[in-house]
């Protein structure tokens, strides 16, 4: 059996297996055990009581985190005319139509989020094989196909995160950086969980939010006591 590194031994001493930690204590622990030199993201995994094999139990959507993600987000918008001007005014990094599609086809994709107006989907639809595998394809269910491009751009820039259940019925999402104050991370987590609750499928039975776990990019998971989140 491989020997535990000094760092892993220290982490095991601080995190009690099987314990549910109050949210603020969990976030403080993440900061304490983080030893890498870059600003790690704080990630959350939420085990949902759904059957993701059934299409009516797939949970997907987006949340605007009140305290942002701590990341700089570059936004591309497929649109034209007055909407193009509105997108630029809202802070979009790249705005275009066929010219932007041509750049995407060349592999020039210096952006993290793609937004499109409905009339632009005839152009964006041709890029599905490029944007889809990268998780960049605009979708009305998460607010990235919209006539209100200004709000969509501001949301993307301001800390909007997207989520979708994986094959095991788990939502994975980043809710900030390890350097955030615990209260700020807690507010972000509460916003996400509130939207997940609203997105609960009517066909889901039993306990819906089964487990909430937080971790850093390179660290172990810490189970959160959900009762501490409303406090």
From Swiss-Prot:
GO cellular component: cytosolic large ribosomal subunit
MF terms in GO: rRNA binding; structural constituent of ribosome; tRNA binding
Record flagged with keyword Glycoprotein: no
Highest taxon in the source lineage: Bacteria
GO BP of this protein: regulation of translation; translation
TM stretches of this protein: none
SUPFAM superfamilies xrefs: Ribosomal protein L1
Pfam families: Ribosomal_L1
Family: Belongs to the universal ribosomal protein uL1 family.
Self-association state and partner proteins as the record states: Part of the 50S ribosomal subunit.
Function: Binds directly to 23S rRNA. The L1 stalk is quite mobile in the ribosome, and is involved in E site tRNA release. Protein L1 is also a translational repressor protein, it controls the translation of the L11 operon by binding to its mRNA.
Name used for this protein in its record: Large ribosomal subunit protein uL1
Organism: Thioalkalivibrio sulfidiphilus (strain HL-EbGR7)
Lineage start: Bacteria, Pseudomonadati, Pseudomonadota, Gammaproteobacteria, Chromatiales
Gene that specifies this protein: rplA
């Amino acid at each position: 059996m491989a020997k535990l590194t000094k760092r892993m031994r220290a982490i095991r001493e601080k995190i009690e297996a099987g314990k549910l930690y109050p949210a603020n204590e969990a976030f403080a622990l993440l900061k304490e055990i983080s030893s890498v030199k870059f600003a790690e993201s704080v990630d959350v995994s939420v085990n949902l009581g759904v059957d993701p094999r059934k299409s009516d139990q797939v949970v997907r959507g987006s949340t605007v985190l009140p305290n942002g993600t701590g990341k700089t987000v570059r936004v591309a918008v497929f649109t034209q005319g007055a909407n193009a001007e509105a997108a630029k005014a809202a802070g979009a990094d790249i705005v275009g139509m066929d010219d932007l599609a041509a750049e995407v086809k060349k592999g020039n994709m210096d952006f993290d989020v793609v937004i499109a107006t409905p009339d632009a989907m005839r152009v964006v639809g041709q890029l599905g094989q490029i944007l889809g595998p990268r998780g960049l394809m605009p979708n009305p269910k998460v607010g990235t196909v919209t006539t209100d491009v200004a709000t969509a751009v501001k949301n993307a820039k301001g800390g909007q995160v997207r989520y979708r259940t994986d094959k095991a019925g788990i939502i994975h999402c980043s809710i900030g950086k390890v350097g955030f104050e615990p209260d700020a991370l807690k507010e972000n987590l509460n916003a996400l969980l509130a939207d997940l609750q609203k997105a609960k499928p009517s066909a889901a039975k039993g306990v819906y939010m089964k487990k909430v776990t937080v971790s850093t990019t390179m660290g172990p998971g810490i189970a959160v006591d959900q009762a501490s989140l409303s406090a």
